[in-house]
């Protein structure tokens, strides 16, 4: 049962464990795709994205199915929403939206059935529940022939919310646009997508590899670079404008002061781990209407470009804004949270986020150290098996989840590998003696 004013503390942190290749990064990647489908109208029309999807989506089925339940508070009501999405290849070989559905109910109701807000099959609107007849007609008309490559929420944002907000600004209105009130559930879906923040470990973020291959296809020999590839790369780069990178941060001039404040806070954060850090300087170069910003670490007797910091410090630089979003109330997914981070630092961060974070954090890891922190909280540990099934940890008397996991006593995670299994693999066996 969900209360009228649910308190997420005690339920706001989750670690996903599993053997190598079990699909942990696949879960986080799916959330990244979900976010982009919900918020970016041009996502599926990006050729780089299409190549990436073709490489990562299940080869046997050729489909990606995502279902997500989320709670949303609107005025005095708490609403449970369920969103379903199926991506599949169309006749042209591109991934498109085969099926999309949003349904809702009062979160506090035990008996109420889910009400379908919209249902779309192969781009055709089967159901659309909007009480205002004019808005209903406009939505049908303005999304016609677009819903196979763009989601309802991203189109609603592009076709209705942006124009309505601009009109309100022109007329100096301070009330919510009518389109937001009349299409509130679609707006809540878009807002949910905006609250998702996903950090993929570099080895699992394949877009750069795909982009380089795509560029090579068009730049080899006498072929000219396809302009659509260039536009797609630029659009993909802008997606990360709010994320702090080690180098070449692209910052619009009107957002530069906010970027300075973020870097100042980043320096405070890093000083916890490196007490001799005096500050971080921004080396900026002008490029039309943006600044290209590198970070220079300032120590008492020398300066060093952030690129030459340790991998652990570089990881903390990248993670900073994601952790900040979780503290402020965002929903954050981090792949391989433990990579390049000391176990002591990781556990301290998790304790802080669980206690003071207003949002939610879900992360994948191989490090069993955090289990002793996580086991104190509800529904905080999931195990992913070799056959991709999820087994939630349930308390078993005084048993420690970390000990059971190490000993291969968690279902689907046998860890039945012994040192003798490596004999001969590296080119040395009994015959070579």
Sequence positions of predicted segments:
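Pre-Walker A-like glycine/lysine-rich segment at the N-terminus of P-loop NTPase domains
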Residues: 1-33
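Conserved ABC ATPase signature
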Residues: 12-21, 289-324, 331, 337-341
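Post-Walker A helix-loop "phosphate-sensing" segment adjacent to the P-loop in P-loop NTPases
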Residues: 33-46, 327-328, 356-357
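Flexible phosphate/Mg2+-sensing switch loops adjacent to catalytic phosphate-binding sites
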Residues: 37-61, 375
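Electropositive, glycine-dotted interaction segments
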Residues: 84-272
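Extended helical coiled-coil dimerization/tether regions that scaffold
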Residues: 235-307, 424-433
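Short alpha-helix of the ABC ATPase nucleotide-binding domain corresponding to the H-loop/switch region
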Residues: 342-347
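C-terminal lobe/lid and adjacent interdomain/linker elements of RecA-like ASCE P-loop ATPase modules
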Residues: 348-433
């Amino acid at each position: 049962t969900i209360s009228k004013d649910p308190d997420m503390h005690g339920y706001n942190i989750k670690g996903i464990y599993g053997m190598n290749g079990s699909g942990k990064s696949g879960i986080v990647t799916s959330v990244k795709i979900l976010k982009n489908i919900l918020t970016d109208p041009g996502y599926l029309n990006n050729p780089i994205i299409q190549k990436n999807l073709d490489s990562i989506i299940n080869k046997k089925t050729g489909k990606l199915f995502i279902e997500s339940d989320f709670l949303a508070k609107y005025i005095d009501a708490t609403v449970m929403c369920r969103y379903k999405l199926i991506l599949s290849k169309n006749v042209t070989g591109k991934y498109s939206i085969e099926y999309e559905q949003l349904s809702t109910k009062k979160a506090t109701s035990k008996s109420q059935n889910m009400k379908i807000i919209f249902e779309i099959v192969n781009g055709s609107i089967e159901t659309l529940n909007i009480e205002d007849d004019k808005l209903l007609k406009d939505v049908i008309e303005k999304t016609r022939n677009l819903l196979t490559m763009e989601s309802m929420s991203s189109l609603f944002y592009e076709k209705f919310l942006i124009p309505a907000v601009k009109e309100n600004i022109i007329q100096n209105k301070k009330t919510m646009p009518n389109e937001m009130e009349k299409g509130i559930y679609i707006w809540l879906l878009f807002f949910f997508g905006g609250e998702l923040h996903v950090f993929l470990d570099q080895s699992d973020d394949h877009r750069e590899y795909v982009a380089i291959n795509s560029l090579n296809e068009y730049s080899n020999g006498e072929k000219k670079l396809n302009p659509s590839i260039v536009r797609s790369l630029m659009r993909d780069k802008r997606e990360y404008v709010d994320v702090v990178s080690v180098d070449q941060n692209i910052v619009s001039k009107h957002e530069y002061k906010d970027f300075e404040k973020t870097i100042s806070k980043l320096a405070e954060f890093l000083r916890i781990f490196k007490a001799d850090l005096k500050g971080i300087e921004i080396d900026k170069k002008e490029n039309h209407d943006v600044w290209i910003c590198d970070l220079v670490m300032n120590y008492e007797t020398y300066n060093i470009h952030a690129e030459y910091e340790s991998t652990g410090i570089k990881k903390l630089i990248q993670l900073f804004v994601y952790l900040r979003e979780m503290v402020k109330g965002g929903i954050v997914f981090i792949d391989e949270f433990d990579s390049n981070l000391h176990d002591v630092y990781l556990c301290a961060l998790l304790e802080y986020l669980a206690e003071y974070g207003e949002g939610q954090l879900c992360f994948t890891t191989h490090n069993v150290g955090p289990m002793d922190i996580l086991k104190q909280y509800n529904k905080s540990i999931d195990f992913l098996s070799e056959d991709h099934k999820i087994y939630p940890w349930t308390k078993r008397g005084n048993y420690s989840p970390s000990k059971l996991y190490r000993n291969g006593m968690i279902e689907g995670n046998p860890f039945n590998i012994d040192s003798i299994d490596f004999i001969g693999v590296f080119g040395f066996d009994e015959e070579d003696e």
